[in-house]
Amino acid sequence: MAADLKSPRRIATEEAFSIPEVAAGLRGVARAPGNSLDLILVKRIYDAPKDDHPQMAALLPGLLDLEEKRLPDMDKNGVAMQLLSLTAPGVQMFDADTATELATLANDRLAEVISRHPTRFAGLAAFAPQSPKRAVKEMERAIKTLKLNGFIVNSHTNNDYFDNPKFFPILEAAEALDGCI
């Protein structure tokens, strides 16, 4: 049963998803040496022993499901639409090449599910800030070709934030594309 659209529509605006390739990559990140505070979250979501963190172990299947259980759950809870974005930490913990590839793949999958359910889902595109030039190209593709609604960046990228001038081309592209970040 679809949400009652005669009443005010309930739109969930911070709905995370992932794809198997990102999950596998983050599992690898979780198992690599490092001291980033982000590793705590990554380990709990992507590499937690089920016995140690049963709630976190149950989280990943929900992130990977974009239709089978998500749509009935939306109906059950009266949610007419979800604004989907790649879950934290996005592609920020990968090298530039891997991040670019995974962001492109995630955006393609997101656009596919939106095309199947355009009244139920909208989406924010991921991009790889590690390579601002390639990020701008993916941002343009996401808005112009995939018809996504804006962009998601999950926190910092290699301990750099968007006030660093190297990221200004990304901010300029978002403005030119009239896309929110």
What do the predicted segments below correspond to?
Residues 1-181:
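Helix-coil boundary/capping segments in enzymes
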